[in-house]
Amino acid sequence: MLSLRVACLILSLASTVWTADTGTTSEFIEAGGDIRGPRIVERQPSQCKETDWPFCSDEDWNHKCPSGCRMKGLIDEANQDFTNRINKLKNSLFDFQKNNKDSNSLTRNIMEYLRGDFANANNFDNTFGQVSEDLRRRIQILKRKVIEKAQQIQVLQKDVRDQLIDMKRLEVDIDIKIRSCKGSCSRSVSREINLKDYEGQQKQLEQVIAKDLLPAKDRQYLPAIKMSPVPDLVPGSFKSQLQEGPPEWKALTEMRQMRMELERPGKDGASRGDLPGDSRGDSATRGPGSKIENPMTPGHGGSGYWRPGSSGSGSDGNWGSGTTGSDDTGTWGAGSSRPSSGSGNLKPSNPDWGEFSEFGGSSSPATRKEYHTGKLVTSKGDKELLIGNEKVTSTGTSTTRRSCSKTITKTVLGNDGHREVVKEVVTSDDGSDCGDGMDLGLTHSFSGRLDELSRMHPELGSFYDSRFGSLTSNFKEFGSKTSDSDIFTDIENPSSHVPEFSSSSKTSTVRKQVTKSYKMADEAASEAHQEGDTRTTKRGRARTMRDCDDVLQTHPSGAQNGIFSIKLPGSSKIFSVYCDQETSLGGWLLIQQRMDGSLNFNRTWQDYKRGFGSLNDKGEGEFWLGNDYLHLLTLRGSVLRVELEDWAGKEAYAEYHFRVGSEAEGYALQVSSYQGTAGDALMEGSVEEGTEYTSHSNMQFSTFDRDADQWEENCAEVYGGGWWYNSCQAANLNGIYYPGGTYDPRNNSPYEIENGVLWVPFRGADYSLWAVRMKIRPLVGQ
């Protein structure tokens, strides 16, 4: 029985296994045979349960591998990854666009703000330059006034000292006369003199005089601030990138930067021979490898040349002068006042701008007028003062002056046949063309005095103030009194002359109505107004200065050093000079200069008479102004200033009251009242050699071809250079230029003698100075 049970169990198990292998169980279950009630079913996240997929062979790839479930999973995973990356890129792009827009807006605002700052900075720079220049000018004026007042105080101190000495001398004289009266005077007059009081006052006064009221030497030159834009602030490569960049960045190309430099007028940064980069063009021995710079042949970038009588920057418009009339016509020239041979009319003493009224009047027959003018032809460039007939090859300014004259002959008959004949002839001294459009002016007649015109025309009273001066001469066109007008350059010619004759038994009246515009040589405009029978002409003209002090007071650019045109009283010639307005009171006219030995000063009498050499507009060069000019410039007395500088940079000066005689007097030298630090070489001379043999005062001028010295031989021939020799010299600024300073006279040929550029009291006779200058200015009070 037990074995049967075991066999049944084995059969049951075998059937169960067989059912599972053949799928009958599944069918059975599907048929509902395994239903045992509700059961919990777990949802699988994916039907792809297998993760370990076998490798696919080539033949199994299409129909068996890979699994679709596996492919779907890989595709979904890659799609999700790409989607995340794209979203991240989109978010980054949106952020960058927003930031870019914000940065562009901020950049634009910043550049606009900076553009305004740049404009304000440029305005501030310009304002600062103007204010500093105005301040410097005011300080210069104040300094000049202080120096002038200090000199006046010194003069007053000397006057007080002289008066004190005179009072003391007078006291002594009175005491002597009282003591000499032995009669009743000795019994009735009791007088005591206290000389100690005078001595005490004199000592106190000497202490006051000993105080130096003038500014120190180191404060003599007032520095100037020079502002100039910096070129190429942005390099070229960056500038091209800015041009191609956004519009807001182009504001950087408009940015300007100013360079500010502090300059000292009259002083160079390296003005000594032992300093590198010497800019003054000195001789070859001043430094190794240096080269003499000849001012007659300037190098690249040097200044041009300017001949005397020319007109350029820094000078007024010059005009030809010297009109000539008939025997009964008043004659006058520019810048002077002299009576005519007939009526004695005078030119206005101050020929500034003014207003003139012309009234009709009776005319006399056979009235002749002659006008003269000068025509300038100027080319651009720098200017240089050229003295004498020195030939200069340069690309600078060249000026040609053409002198032209216009003669008008006018004839008016009486009532028995009215006839008016006007003949005009224009001639030139050198045969040059004066131009068809040139108008030499008109002749204006005046009734009454010019000071009455300001009362007649109060609305035009500004023309009669102190700026333009008062014109007090009387002018009449017809009759025995006539005068000539200024010289004008016609710019417009709408004039109409309408003669009107009135019937009369004795006289003929001519009325003119003229409307004409003129322009002067310095481009000053003037107008002519027509009012019935009265013609009023407002004129302008350039006032010609007579010296550098006049230039300092009246010229718009007179406070700066430079070349100016002047015209001496009593002379019709206009010539150019160099004015030094920085030294002392200013107004110094340079008459001689030595600075590099480039010019030979051993010249003839005629050379020294006319002058020779050249200067550029910076005052560099060697020259002699001319003895004729020295005589005319010092007629009324002048102050001579001699400035000396040795090769070590030591400076000294000497000042004298100065006058040069005429050629008939041998250009005799008259000096007095020495002041300075160089020593008195012109009056006292050399003490060792003897004052009577070496003093230059009252000596005539001598050259190698005209001996006027006190020596038995010719000093000018032995020592070289024209000078006021005695027997022979204690000073000779026109001697031989020896580079280096000290020289051995034994090496000189043909004469073994001290013939350098010397001032014996300063550095001795065997020392040739590096730079010397002679300047003159009018005496104070003239």
Swiss-Prot record:
GO terms for cellular component: blood microparticle; cell cortex; cell surface; external side of plasma membrane; extracellular space; fibrinogen complex; platelet alpha granule; synapse. The modification Phosphoserine is found at residues 279, 326, 470, 526. Residues 264-283, 522-536 have a biased composition (Basic and acidic residues). Residues 68-547 form a coiled coil. Residues 324-344, 354-364 have a biased composition (Low complexity). Residues 311-323 have a biased composition (Gly residues). It is found in: Secreted. PROSITE patterns: FIBRINOGEN_C_1, FIBRINOGEN_C_2. Glycans are attached at residue 602. InterPro entries: FIB_ANG-like, Fibrinogen-like_C, Fibrinogen_a/b/g_C_1, Fibrinogen_a/b/g_C_dom, Fibrinogen_a/b/g_coil_dom, Fibrinogen_aC, Fibrinogen_CS. Keywords: Adaptive immunity, Blood coagulation, Calcium, Coiled coil, Disulfide bond, Glycoprotein, Hemostasis, Hydroxylation, Immunity, Innate immunity, Metal-binding, Phosphoprotein, Secreted, Signal. Ca(2+) binds at residues 707, 709, 711, 713. One of its GO terms (biological process) is protein polymerization. The modification 4-hydroxyproline is found at residue 499. Residues 539-780 form the Fibrinogen C-terminal domain. Residues 1-19 form the signal peptide. The record marks 36-37, 101-102, 122-125 as: Cleavage. Disulfide bonds join 404-434, 715-728. One of its GO terms (molecular function) is signaling receptor binding. Pfam families: Fib_alpha, Fibrinogen_aC, Fibrinogen_C. Conversion of fibrinogen to fibrin is triggered by thrombin, which cleaves fibrinopeptides A and B from alpha and beta chains, and thus exposes the N-terminal polymerization sites responsible for the formation of the soft clot. The soft clot is converted into the hard clot by factor XIIIA which catalyzes the epsilon-(gamma-glutamyl)lysine cross-linking between gamma chains (stronger) and between alpha chains (weaker) of different monomers. A long coiled coil structure formed by 3 polypeptide chains connects the central nodule to the C-terminal domains (distal nodules). The long C-terminal ends of the alpha chains fold back, contributing a fourth strand to the coiled coil structure. Cleaved by the protease thrombin to yield monomers which, together with fibrinogen beta (FGB) and fibrinogen gamma (FGG), polymerize to form an insoluble fibrin matrix. Fibrin has a major function in hemostasis as one of the primary components of blood clots. In addition, functions during the early stages of wound repair to stabilize the lesion and guide cell migration during re-epithelialization. Was originally thought to be essential for platelet aggregation, based on in vitro studies using anticoagulated blood. Heterohexamer; disulfide linked. Contains 2 sets of 3 non-identical chains (alpha, beta and gamma). The 2 heterotrimers are in head to head conformation with the N-termini in a small central domain. This is Fibrinogen alpha chain. The lineage of its organism: Eukaryota, Metazoa, Chordata, Craniata, Vertebrata.
